[in-house]
């Protein structure tokens, strides 16, 4: 697992989890704003993403275990956690399974929804286990020798724009320098083409929503108002009745799914207000 830090090593730790098909260096503008406020910001590339190794197994449970391993290796005791999209959902679910792993959780468009999220498309599982395992094995056979299509950095940036249409070309081009590699025949994104989100066994998004009222630590959710393909489609009015009374939910007008990239200073400001001074939570 490739890990990253911003800020002083002896500062109060703050764990940040990126979203699906992203990598930790997408935090290169956002994370320093948190570090400048006195936090030691810690993140990692999920398995198969960025500079972390490709794996034989990709599943929701594997990502959850990786989160716990990284946190326990880097931080002693509870700490605040921030997660975007899939990363937010991972933080929420891990905290529900292991209460007080975190002192509080911030989910940037990553709170549970009745709708299946697009970056965890196969997390909604209702079929029999035999069919699930067969499907997973078939996918591994199809993708065992797959490699990503090469191109120039400009071409890779344009391809990523299909997934991130609201983000500037300059930013997407920058990401090619930290999230892609140069081979003899061109540049390729480092993300494993065999990635498959989800896992085995039944799962419904509603189950996560039903567990929210008993969330064990302070919870802060941020949602944008502009829907896009990678967004989770969570509507604030649908979500509010399921939140704990102490939870905070901010709706950022005019922002899309990648709120912390579109508006890093505003997003960091809202989160820092929620967190308080380093060490208070």
Predicted regions and their residues:
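Alpha/beta-hydrolase
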Residues: 146-227
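Alpha/beta-hydrolase fold catalytic core
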Residues: 1-15, 36-39, 76-77, 112, ...
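Conserved loop-alpha-helix segment in the C-terminal half of the alpha/beta-hydrolase fold
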Residues: 213-255
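Flexible "cap/lid" loop of the alpha/beta hydrolase fold
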Residues: 96, 104-149
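Catalytic histidine-centered segment of alpha/beta-hydrolase-like enzymes
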Residues: 252-264
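Active-site loop/oxyanion-hole signature of alpha/beta-hydrolase fold enzymes
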Residues: 36, 42, 46-82, 86, ...
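Conserved HGGG/HGGXW glycine-rich cap/lid loop of the alpha/beta-hydrolase fold
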Residues: 4-53
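Post-His helix in hydrolase/transferase enzymes
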Residues: 261-273
């Amino acid at each position: 697992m490739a890990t990253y830090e911003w800020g002083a090593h002896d500062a109060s730790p703050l764990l940040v989890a990126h979203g699906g098909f992203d990598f930790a260096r997408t935090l290169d503008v956002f994370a320093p704003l948190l570090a400048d406020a006195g936090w030691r910001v810690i993140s990692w590339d999920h398995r198969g993403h960025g500079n972390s190794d490709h794996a034989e197994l990709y599943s929701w449970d594997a990502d959850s275990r990786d989160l716990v391993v990284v946190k326990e290796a880097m931080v002693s005791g509870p700490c605040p956690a921030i997660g975007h999209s899939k990363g937010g959902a991972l933080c929420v679910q891990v905290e529900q399974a292991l209460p007080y792993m975190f002192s509080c959780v911030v989910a940037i468009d990553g709170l549970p929804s009745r709708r299946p999220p697009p970056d965890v498309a196969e997390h909604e599982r209702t079929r029999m286990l035999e069919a699930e395992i067969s499907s997973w094995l078939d996918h591994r056979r199809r993708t065992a020798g797959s490699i990503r299509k090469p191109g120039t950095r400009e071409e890779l940036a344009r391809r990523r724009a299909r997934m991130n249409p609201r983000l500037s070309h300059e930013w997407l081009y920058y990401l090619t320098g930290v999230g892609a590699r140069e081979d003899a025949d061109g540049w390729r994104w480092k993300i494993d083409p065999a990635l498959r989100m989800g896992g085995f066994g039944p799962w419904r998004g509603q189950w996560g929503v039903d567990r929210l009222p008993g969330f064990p630590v302070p919870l802060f959710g941020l949602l944008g108002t502009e829907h896009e393909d990678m967004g989770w489609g969570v509507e604030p009015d649908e979500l509010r009745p399921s939140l704990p009374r102490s939870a905070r939910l901010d709706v950022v007008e005019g922002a899309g799914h990648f709120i912390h990239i579109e508006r890093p200073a505003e997003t960091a400001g809202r989160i820092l207000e929620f967190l308080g001074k380093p060490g208070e939570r």
